[in-house]
């Protein structure tokens, strides 16, 4: 197996390759420039590198821009020949106890002033791009699930996520009780 780490400044992007296929883990940055170059140039280099790989999939570890901005750029600016065979996303959607988390993620995205653990969230942007480009296969990963026949999802830990969500929810309920009554 070969591991290729891409310099994306503040963000994550690396590729795990074996003889059969590759898995890009995250694809984003918060930087507008990386080593003096516009980030779109860095994204284009990564996309060009990936275009030589026939079977490629993507794992997004979570929904922050420093992990998915390159994917959004690619989906907006490149034709479908650059698409991934499969995109793996953390499953924060299926379990009922995660419904508050989903509402807070979407709310944070709407107001662009995230109260969630000090990160910018862009779930709307991702969902919009995936719906617009319906050639992508998406698989939701819950903690412990094996994917690609050799990797195991370690997140989301729904207990930890629920605890963090409850903290944010309680803080928002304290500050904005009328709004929270409408939302929940």
Model region roles, listed by residue range:
Residues 1-51:
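Conserved beta-strand hairpin/beta-sheet module of binuclear metal-dependent hydrolase folds
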Residues 27-28, 61-63, 156:
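Active-site-proximal beta-strand/loop segments in catalytic clefts of secreted hydrolases
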Residues 36-89:
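Active-site metal-binding motif and surrounding structural segment of the metallo-beta-lactamase
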Residues 1-2, 32-37, 61-65, 126-130, ...:
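Short linear motifs at secondary-structure transitions and domain/linker junctions
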Residues 13-15, 55, 115:
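Generic recognition of cysteine residues
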Residues 1, 73-184:
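Flexible, acidic/histidine-containing loops and adjacent segments that form or flank the divalent-metal
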Residues 10-12, 31-32, 63-69, 94-97, ...:
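Active-site environment of divalent metal-dependent phosphoester hydrolases
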């Amino acid at each position: 197996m070969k591991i290729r780490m891409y310099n994306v400044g503040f963000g994550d992007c690396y590729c795990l390759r074996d003889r059969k296929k590759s898995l890009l883990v995250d694809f984003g940055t918060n930087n507008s420039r990386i080593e003096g170059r516009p980030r779109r140039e860095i994204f284009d280099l990564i996309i060009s590198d990936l275009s030589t790989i026939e079977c490629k999939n993507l794992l997004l570890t979570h929904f922050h821009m420093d992990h998915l901005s390159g994917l959004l750029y690619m989906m907006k600016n490149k034709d479908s020949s650059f698409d991934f065979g499969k995109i793996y996303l953390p499953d924060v959607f299926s379990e009922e106890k995660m419904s508050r988390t989903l509402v807070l993620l979407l709310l944070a995205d709407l107001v662009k002033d995230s109260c969630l653990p000090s990160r910018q969230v862009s779930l709307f942007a991702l969902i919009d791009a995936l719906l617009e480009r319906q050639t992508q296969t998406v698989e939701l990963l819950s903690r412990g699930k094996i994917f690609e026949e050799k990797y195991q999802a370690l997140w989301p830990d729904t207990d930890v996520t629920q605890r963090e969500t409850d903290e944010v929810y309680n803080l928002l309920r304290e500050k904005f009780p009328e709004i929270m009554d409408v939302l929940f």
